[in-house]
């Protein structure tokens, strides 16, 4: 069958943190309900276990888009930020589980094998015109043609993502003022700086065995580990994704940015430099001691730090999710 391509995950995705997220985090994700109907319409038969999970994978998405553009000469993008997570346990090696992609029409399925070292399965792919069989070892990525179904043989855990043809993404910004702070999970926000008087920032908050705040503010990097009290506040309900809607535009039309008030962000936190590190304080959250590489710009740091506090207090659909962490890209005036 033409159009079936298999990649090694490490060769396809050039981002170590996202690769580790795919390999290690998906099995702990809770199920989500507010999901595009096209994802729900992926029919799963047999005795397979199925879960619908958030799959914010921007680097994988870009890599798949590049591959598909070379084949179809068109842009592709994710239909939904969610994915089907499937556990197949087929010890007798007989075909099991029908995954039918005739709903939705014109979808390009991308299948990632995760799980254990010994896991391996075969995909028996079928369309109206042809059939094919491919072997999918651990951490392999299969990009399938449109409008196909497939059976499986063997044992594996699979992530199924759906792509379709798309035009270029619409701009995130329409009108802004110098008193706006804009955040989004989409990195392309950084390409829409209104002027050179604005700066970019990136925030990642991870809370597993400890809570880590990582910020890049106008090129300066900060890395902070929370104390036990602050960690307890940040880690509470870290995996609660029940309030998150999809952004598919056919079932859900959530805004892709949030606009915050610059003055509120500037006054919502504090920081000061001591001999060894930057001390940063978030009211009602806690204090962080952060290392720093780059120039110390207190106003910019306070704006980004207050955005981090906003994320901790308000865990909705705006930030991207990556296992036990979440992240945003942001811009603000200097």
Curated annotation (Swiss-Prot):
Give a single Pfam family match: Pox_A51
Q: Which UniProt keywords apply?
A: Early protein
Induction remarks? Expressed in the early phase of the viral replicative cycle.
The Swiss-Prot or TrEMBL record describes its family as follows:
Belongs to the orthopoxvirus OPG181 family.
InterPro entries (alphabetical):
Poxvirus_A51 (IPR007032)
Species of origin reads Monkeypox virus
Q: What is this protein called?
A: Protein OPG181
């Amino acid at each position: 069958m033409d159009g079936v391509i298999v990649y090694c995950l490490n060769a396809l995705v050039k981002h170590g943190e996202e690769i580790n997220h795919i390999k290690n985090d998906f099995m702990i994700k809770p199920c989500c309900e507010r999901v595009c109907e096209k994802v729900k319409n992926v029919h799963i038969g047999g005795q397979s276990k199925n879960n619908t999970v958030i799959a914010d994978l921007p680097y994988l998405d870009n890599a798949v888009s590049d591959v598909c553009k070379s084949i179809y000469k068109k842009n592709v993008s994710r239909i939904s930020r969610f994915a089907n997570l499937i556990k197949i346990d087929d010890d007798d090696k007989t075909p099991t589980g029908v995954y039918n992609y005739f709903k939705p029409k014109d979808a390009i399925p991308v299948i990632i094998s995760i799980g254990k070292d010994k896991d391996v399965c075969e995909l028996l792919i079928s369309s109206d015109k042809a059939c094919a069989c491919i072997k999918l070892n651990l951490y392999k990525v299969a990009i399938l043609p449109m409008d196909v179904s497939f059976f499986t043989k063997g044992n594996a855990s699979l992530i199924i993502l759906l792509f379709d043809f798309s035009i270029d993404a619409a701009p995130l910004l329409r009108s802004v003022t110098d008193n706006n702070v804009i955040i989004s999970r989409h990195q392309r926000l950084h390409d829409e700086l209104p002027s050179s008087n604005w700066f970019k920032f990136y925030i990642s908050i991870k809370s597993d065995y400890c809570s880590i705040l990582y910020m890049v503010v106008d090129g300066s990097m900060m890395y902070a580990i929370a104390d036990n009290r602050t960690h307890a506040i940040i880690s509470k309900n870290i995996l609660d994704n029940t309030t998150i809607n999809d952004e598919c535009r056919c079932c859900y039309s959530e805004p892709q940015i949030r606009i915050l008030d610059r003055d509120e962000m500037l006054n919502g936190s504090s920081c000061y430099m001591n001999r060894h590190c930057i001390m940063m304080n978030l009211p009602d959250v806690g204090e962080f001691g952060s290392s720093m590489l780059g120039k110390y710009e207190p106003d910019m740091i306070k704006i980004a730090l207050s955005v981090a506090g906003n994320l901790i207090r308000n865990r909705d659909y705006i930030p991207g999710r990556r296992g036990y962490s979440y992240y945003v890209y942001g811009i603000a005036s200097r």
